[in-house]
């Protein structure tokens, strides 16, 4: 309708216009922060909790407006929503605490021409076309809290992807290679455009309460493996995560590390139909002991949490590990220590009211050298016996 063009050409820049367009500024502000016009989080990715709060608020506002046929208001809130999603995946915005690349220059020194120039604008000022022809947007959820949660993960993927373009962009800029400079920016921009399309499509589906059965069915269970834990607020593990056993013990997605160097597929001894077998997990996290992984989850969207917890079938022969799972700080599971070749525990835990889920692995004795702990196939499941909350 009439708001399509303003959404594409004006509202998507709305958070940048809060001081010059008083009429638009309220659509980039939050009730919880009255009087604050410029929300930094709409431009720079923050912690998972902060980003989730922003996604929930602005997606919710847009959905509420569209449900009441306030198309103009919905389009303005949608502009803020897609702006932050695209900025979180823009190479110029994704280096933590270094928006002007002053620290980055120390790692990748520029030629004299750029020695004293803040590089932020140059990293995002290419000339290219963003085309996602043929892309079919995907549904991110059947409720606002669920959709914000799924968009959070996809935005984290966008941030990581954009970080991979920073060095190619700077190398091309330093070398005066305009084509390569534009191409690296374009790659990240197309990723962001697809994410924005997912958000807009989901917004409309939520407002009109229309969900294809296949789309909704695909959201019945969610793999928690690829969500960033709260211990990695900037999507990488800080130094504090590297002080555990064995090796450095830090969380490794999809693998355990032999001697701290060689990735080994996640494998656990499990009991199936009364027999013990070794199961390889494509999805999961390998950790050492003194490990805590904390995940934000949307309240009452998912009914249960399932995971297999144990020692790696090949590397954990001398291990002694205690596994605990906490929800909102209260113990959901406290397993008797797993030792050596003991089979893993398979857990199925209720999640009612829980917004904070912690997976904890600690040493239960020994020297820790065999404490190759595995969280296999951690996933969130909806209650299939009732309709989705909308």
What are these regions (language model features)?
Residues 13-15, 20, 81, 203, ...:
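Hydrophobic alpha-helical elements and their junctions with loops/disorder across both membrane
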Residues 85-90, 315:
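Short alpha-helix boundary/capping elements
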Residues 1-76, 91-205, 209-216:
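N-terminal, motif-rich segments that launch catalysis or mediate targeting to/interaction with membranes
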Residues 211-390:
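Gly-Asp-aromatic-enriched flexible segments
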Residues 74-86:
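Short alpha-helix carrying the canonical HExxH Zn2+-binding catalytic motif
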